């Protein structure tokens, strides 16, 4: 019987969801702590059978979003997200609302961390091809996905499955460059998965 894998609601460039059936069977049968060293959209780490999972990524907004998913129930995430979408008048065609929210996210000094995280994910859902992209100054710069990207029932189902699974695993979030990760604490049955960005390509995550 084929394994049914959970799909991340984050369309991170280089995500491995479509080839999980080729990757995960190569992992050890027993893993105490699984380290997803370049966590990204977390398609691999969320689907690994391990006692503990460490999500590591150098992009802080991603780490904060993954942590938010882990700390909230799926109902809370969905309800808060839908309220935020409505508050910001986002839809498939409202370019002005998207640009206004993107400008707010890039320049507003947030006093409420949850508001910042929800704004970030709301932007992703209405960005071109749901892509996550920052410039060298860490300003979010993905364009509007007019008539292409939006929050919909499929997205809602993905969020629910993903967050429900996250709530069931023992997860730790790490915000380190891979060279700064403390490998000295790893033990015999721990496993590190490395899928680094493709620095010699023109992928959007290299902008």
Show which residues each predicted segment covers.
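Conserved SAM-binding loop
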Residues: 66-67
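Short active-site oxyanion
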Residues: 30-33, 51-52, 168-171
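Short alpha-helix immediately C-terminal to the canonical SAM-binding loop
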Residues: 63
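S-adenosyl-L-methionine
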Residues: 1-39, 43-44, 48
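Conserved N-terminal glycine-rich FAD pyrophosphate-binding loop of Rossmann-like flavoproteins
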Residues: 70
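SAM-dependent nucleic-acid methyltransferase catalytic core
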Residues: 2-18, 74-193, 197-202
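Conserved proline-anchored active-site loop of SAM-dependent methyltransferases
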Residues: 23, 34-48, 55-60, 121-128, ...
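Short, surface-exposed loop/helix-turn segments at secondary-structure junctions
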Residues: 205-207
